[in-house]
Every structure is written in structure tokens, then in C-alpha cells.
UniProtKB/Swiss-Prot annotation:
InterPro entries: Nedd8-like, Ubiquitin-like_dom, Ubiquitin-like_domsf, Ubiquitin_CS, Ubiquitin_dom, Ubiquitin_ubiquitin-like. Cleavage of precursor form is necessary for function. The lineage of its organism: Eukaryota, Metazoa, Ecdysozoa, Arthropoda, Hexapoda. This is Ubiquitin-like protein NEDD8. GO terms for molecular function: protein tag activity; ubiquitin protein ligase binding. Disruption phenotype: Flies die from growth arrest in the first-instar larval stage. It comes from Drosophila melanogaster. Its main location: nucleus. The gene is Nedd8. SUPFAM superfamilies: Ubiquitin-like (SSF54236).
Length: 84
């Protein structure tokens, strides 16, 4: 089934998946098309963040559904310096 993944810039990526595909597999497909590593991706469907271990069917994703891609960027380490 064909679904769409919408990025924050509004770009829509069309991906062919199976209902039994896990979310981590969907993220791999996004990486193939956009070059974004799965660990930096957060997929949102119906207002909920999708768990990597669940399937598209678990979230009731159907053909024509639109998932929203959010980037999960990790912040740098903070360095504490004593005030003198």
C-alpha cells in the first residue's frame, strides 16, 4: 500500500509498505529516499509518536495515510564551569 510521509518543509515522500511492516522498516525506507538516519527520525500518525517495534497495522495506517516526520536531534553536552 502507498502512504505518504510529510516532512517539516512540507515535502511529501511516497512510500510503498505492507501493513505488517514495523515502524523501524518504514524509517529505513525514508532513509533510502531522503538520507535521514532512522535514529534521527520520529514518525507521527494521528497525533501520536510511532514506536519502532509496532507495525503499520497496529496504528491502523492504511493506503493514502499521511505520516509526519519530525527530526529528533540530540543536544550537545553541557559544560559546567565554576564561577570564581
Amino acid at each position: 500500500m502507498l502512504i505518504k510521509v510529510k516532512t517539516l518543509t512540507g515535502k511529501e515522500i511516497e512510500i510503498d509498505i505492507e501493513p505488517t511492516d514495523k515502524v523501524d522498516r518504514i524509517k529505513e525506507r525514508v532513509e533510502e529516499k531522503e538520507g535521514i538516519p532512522p535514529q534521527q527520525q520520529r514518525l507521527i500518525f494521528s497525533g501520536k509518536q510511532m514506536n519502532d517495534d509496532k507495525t503499520a497495522a497496529d496504528y491502523k495506517v492504511q493506503g493514502g495515510s499521511v505520516l509526519h516526520l519530525v527530526l529528533a536531534l540530540r543536544g550537545g553536552d553541557s559544560i559546567l564551569t565554576p564561577c570564581v
